[in-house]
Amino acid sequence: MNKPLILVVEDDNSVKNLITTTLKAHDYRYLTAPNGGGAILEASSHNPDIVLLDL
């Protein structure tokens, strides 16, 4: 069974690296986007199961 595909939307590189390092350590599949516009493009292209974003 594939783990869920997670879209990480984060503009702060240190926070993004912390999140993606943790996801990678647990063998999760993930995509990243730096902002809302990039998130919309990634979500429409890849249909993630979960979106993590800051407000």
Where are these regions (language model features)?
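A generic structural motif
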Residues: 26-30
